[in-house]
């Protein structure tokens, strides 16, 4: 079970809603993934109508919605978007995203910390998308964020855990859940994140752009379950030397 703020989730896989060929395919993939927390960009939905093509099927699916502030370039813009989302969707949960450069979509650490502190004070449950910076993640935790969401690689790049060394430090020092977000490209990346101690992963592009998104979503579900189970089972330690799994000479000596 995964506990974040006032909610509990059975699944350690969070999913997004972008880049799918259709709303139907999006919903089928989310169901196949087993995900119970789904992000959606406020700029992509009509907040005035719950029969929006993206919003309506998500509400019907019964998942927890995590609106994000993707598109915001400053703390002020993100705070404004957060209040719109809370008013329209009736949730104080928020994925905080601030990336001023559309080419790289890297999170702005200064604006993110500033917005996070304000939003927490205003009663939001803040899950910030941030760089894999252990110092920043600790500061975000200290201002009251319910979890931290450091990137594995740039958004949509499918490069995997390029920031692994920093992620390990973040995980080791965190007292709130760590959700690896962005860059996860194949199920094995997700399994590795859970094995190394992450509490969850958020996957969007890798599922949405696959030739078969529904089966890819299933693969990610199984990978996350496997990674979590492997961590709980306690992997053996690594070694630079070979260690025989059975005696090498006893049977020869016995037959001599």
Swiss-Prot record:
Pathway per the UniProt entry: Cofactor biosynthesis; thiamine diphosphate biosynthesis
One example GO MF annotation: thiazole synthase activity
UniProt signal peptide: none
Main subcellular location: cytoplasm
SUPFAM superfamilies: ThiG-like
GO biological process: thiamine diphosphate biosynthetic process
A GO cellular component entry from the record: cytoplasm
Keyword Transmembrane helix attributed: no
Family: Belongs to the ThiG family.
Name of the protein in question: Thiazole synthase
Source organism of this protein record: Escherichia coli O6:H1 (strain CFT073 / ATCC 700928 / UPEC)
Phylogenetic classification of the source organism: Bacteria, Pseudomonadati, Pseudomonadota, Gammaproteobacteria, Enterobacterales
């Amino acid at each position: 079970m995964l506990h974040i703020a006032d909610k509990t989730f059975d699944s350690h896989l969070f999913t997004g809603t972008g880049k799918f060929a259709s709303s139907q395919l999006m919903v089928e993939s989310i169901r196949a993934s087993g995900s119970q927390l789904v992000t959606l960009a406020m700029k992509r939905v009509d907040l005035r109508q719950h029969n929006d093509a993206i919003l309506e099927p998500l509400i019907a699916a019964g998942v927890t919605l995590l609106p994000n502030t993707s598109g915001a370039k400053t703390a002020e813009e993100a705070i404004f978007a957060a209040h719109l989302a809370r008013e329209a969707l009736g949730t104080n949960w928020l994925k905080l995203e601030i990336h001023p450069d559309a080419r790289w979509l890297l999170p702005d650490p200064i604006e993110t910390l500033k917005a996070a502190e304000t939003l927490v004070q205003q009663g939001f449950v803040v899950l910030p998308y941030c760089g894999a910076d252990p110092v920043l993640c600790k500061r975000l935790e200290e201002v009251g964020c319910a979890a931290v969401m450091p990137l594995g690689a740039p958004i949509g790049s499918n490069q995997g855990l390029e920031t692994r060394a920093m992620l390990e430090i973040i995980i080791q020092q965190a007292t709130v859940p760590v959700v690896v977000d962005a860059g996860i490209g194949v199920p094995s990346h997700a399994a590795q994140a859970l094995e190394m101690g992450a509490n969850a992963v958020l996957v969007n592009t890798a599922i949405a752009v696959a030739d078969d998104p529904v089966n890819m979503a299933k693969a990610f579900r199984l990978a996350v379950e496997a990674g979590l189970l492997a961590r709980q089972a306690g992997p053996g330690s690594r070694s630079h030397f070979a260690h025989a799994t059975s005696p090498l000479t006893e049977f020869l000596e016995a037959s001599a």
